[in-house]
Amino acid sequence: MGRDTIADIITYIRNADMDKKGTVRIPSTNITENIVKILLREGFIENVRKHRENNKDFLVLTLRHRRNRKRAYRNILKRISRPGLRIYSNSQRIPRISGGIGVVILSTSRGIMTDREARLERIGGEILFYIW
């Protein structure tokens, strides 16, 4: 795990998706737990469970599968703001992904939330990544 935990989460999920694995294990931190809750609520993953091994906590994510197929859905995840170049947006300029089908994950003063929640509360923040 590197210094950019959000990029690591995206990479873990993307690699598991490309390898056609049903589950992926990621290290558990406050940021990863908040992001995983949003992904679960938005329907991009099926299930989450906590796992403890050698005094380290992990989250085991079950990726969403298509009916009657063993392959997972192809989720496109794209990191936007990164440690070397932070990208911020106010509530009016939060981008819409694929006409509202995709989700923008933001870090705001009120925690990590989706673009829809941020628009409703009329707050902006750092654009972490897109998923669609």
Curated annotation (Swiss-Prot):
The gene is rps8. It comes from the Eukaryota. Gene3D superfamilies: 3.30.1370.30, 3.30.1490.10. InterPro entries: Ribosomal_uS8 (IPR000630), Ribosomal_uS8_CS (IPR047863), Ribosomal_uS8_sf (IPR035987). Belongs to the universal ribosomal protein uS8 family. It comes from Nymphaea alba. This is Small ribosomal subunit protein uS8c. It is found in: Plastid, Chloroplast. One of its GO terms (molecular function) is rRNA binding. Keywords: Chloroplast, Plastid, Ribonucleoprotein, Ribosomal protein, RNA-binding, rRNA-binding. GO terms for biological process: translation. The keyword Ribonucleoprotein applies. Its main location: plastid. The keyword Translocase does not apply. SUPFAM superfamilies: Ribosomal protein S8 (SSF56047). Part of the 30S ribosomal subunit. One of its GO terms (cellular component) is ribonucleoprotein complex. NCBIfam families: PRK00136.1.
